[in-house]
């Protein structure tokens, strides 16, 4: 709905009927009439369609392949939700279209996180700017999300959930979890350009203007080749 003022038409999707009902109520309360709501998983509601802009906040919580809470759990293992969105989004971008995606990825032994995220993107056709804004250790990550669902990590339930989660991380050599943004731009059939960076300082300014400048600079440099 935040995109309604910045676009001629908007298609908003969600897997959960209740979420769409809340969205419809908000639209009516704010006299928004250029948004179409569709129900379905991932990109299924927009199969075969392409867009000038994609904004996605998928259920990217990193954990076991199960769904405890629809708003945050994808049912995919570890960072599979972010992987799926990054693999599918380029195929739904119109020429020069852009995607702005929130996501998480695991840091595993013997694999740089940059290589992991880059491996999910196509070898041709996208300019990608990946910004990692935070990294936490497994213990902090698990306790944060347990508290998110009002479970005290010190309770019996909390201890059991913590051990299952941490054991799963250990079994997959996960030593940290990163979080941030992935911004994509369609560049036709040109070789993909992927830049992964880390924000090591507090960032409070709007990121939109910075992303706009990044893609503008990248296009200028591409034209110099």
Report each predicted region and the residues it spans:
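Acidic, low-complexity/disordered tracts enriched in E/D and polar residues
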Residues: 189-225
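Core SAM-dependent methyltransferase catalytic element
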Residues: 126, 148-152, 174-190
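S-adenosylmethionine
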Residues: 15-156, 160-161
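Conserved SAM-binding loop of SAM-dependent methyltransferases across substrates and taxa
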Residues: 1-7
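Conserved SAM-binding motif I beta-strand of class I
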Residues: 9-14
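Glycine-rich, charged/polar anion/phosphate-binding loops
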Residues: 162-171, 197, 201-202
């Amino acid at each position: 709905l935040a995109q309604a003022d910045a676009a001629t038409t908007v298609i908003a999707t969600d897997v959960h009927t209740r979420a769409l009902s809340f969205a419809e109520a908000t639209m009516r309360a704010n006299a928004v009439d250029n948004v179409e709501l569709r129900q379905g998983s991932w990109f299924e509601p927009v199969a075969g369609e392409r867009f000038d802009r994609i904004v996605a906040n998928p259920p990217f919580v990193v954990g076991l392949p199960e769904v405890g809470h629809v708003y945050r759990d994808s049912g995919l293992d570890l960072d599979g939700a972010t992987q799926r969105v990054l693999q599918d989004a380029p195929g739904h971008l119109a020429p020069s279209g852009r995607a702005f995606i929130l996501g998480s990825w695991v840091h595993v032994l013997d694999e740089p996180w940059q290589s992991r995220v880059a491996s999910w993107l196509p070898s041709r056709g996208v300019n990608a700017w990946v910004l990692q804004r935070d990294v936490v250790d497994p213990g902090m990550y698990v306790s944060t999300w347990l508290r998110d669902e009002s479970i005290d990590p010190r309770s019996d339930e909390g201890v059991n959930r913590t051990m299952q989660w941490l054991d799963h991380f250990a079994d997959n050599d996960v030593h940290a979890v990163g979080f941030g943004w992935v911004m994509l731009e369609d560049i036709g059939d040109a070789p993909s350009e992927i830049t992964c960076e880390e924000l090591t300082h507090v960032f409070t300014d709007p990121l939109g203007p910075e992303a706009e400048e990044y893609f503008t600079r990248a296009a200028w440099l591409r034209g110099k080749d």
